Amino acid sequence: MARYTGPVCRLCRREGAKLYLKGERCYTGKCAVDRRTYAPGQHGQGRKKISEYGLQLREKQKARRVYGILEGQFRAYFAEADRQQGVTGENLLRLLETRLDNVVFRLGFARSRNEARQFVLHNHFTLNGKKVNIPSIQLRVGDVIQLKEKSKDTPLFKEIVDGLGQKTPPAWLELDVNTLSGRVIALPKREDIDTNLQEHLIVELYSR
């Protein structure tokens, strides 16, 4: 399945919730979800009764869209989460949160996860001092990512760097604004993850 390249605001409207796919725009009055609270399409304003399966499917789709994951990748993440000890839903969120692109976003080096993915693909960061361009790399406790020297002076990153520190990273991450680096200091717990998801619905869907 190809990655979605259409208008991302339609995805938020489809899910009926802000997925924060367009960075700062999502926090302004320009957000499509605030302006049009109904789903996109000709029949978007019609009221629909959603089945239990439909609710589970929508929650899975929402999770995929929030983290920018393809269907096959998402199934693989769920299978890994199910193999691990502990609560499967929480394991799933932990795997998604510790992806490199998500950590770049959480630290404030990007305004959206999609932007973070592009930054990683274009070699703007190092991981533990080495070049990295794979957004899906799973980070572990102690891993350090850093913005490359040659990237610091670009107009785009100057704007982002100026805003670093205005938003506090989650408790499991540590940001150093002086070295423009971030460290994973713990694995995220459920209470550390502010993503608006009901992961138990996803578990129920895959348990059918």
Curated annotation (Swiss-Prot):
GO cellular component: small ribosomal subunit
Positions of disulphide bridges: none
Keywords from the UniProt entry: Ribonucleoprotein, Ribosomal protein, RNA-binding, rRNA-binding
GO biological process, one term: ribosomal small subunit biogenesis
CDD domains in the cross-refs: S4
Superkingdom of the organism of origin: Bacteria
PROSITE patterns (alphabetical): RIBOSOMAL_S4, S4
Keyword Aminoacyl-tRNA synthetase: no
GO molecular function: rRNA binding; structural constituent of ribosome
Pfam families per UniProt: Ribosomal_S4 (PF00163), S4 (PF01479)
SMART domains: Ribosomal_S4, S4
Annotated ranges, domain S4 RNA-binding: 98-163
Entry-linked InterPro entries: Ribosomal_uS4 (IPR022801), Ribosomal_uS4_bac-type (IPR005709), Ribosomal_uS4_CS (IPR018079), Ribosomal_uS4_N (IPR001912), S4_RNA-bd (IPR002942), S4_RNA-bd_sf (IPR036986)
Parts forming coiled coils: none
Function: One of the primary rRNA binding proteins, it binds directly to 16S rRNA where it nucleates assembly of the body of the 30S subunit. With S5 and S12 plays an important role in translational accuracy.
Subunit and partners: Part of the 30S ribosomal subunit. Contacts protein S5. The interaction surface between S4 and S5 is involved in control of translational fidelity.
Protein family (similarity comment): Belongs to the universal ribosomal protein uS4 family.
Name listed for the protein in its UniProt record: Small ribosomal subunit protein uS4
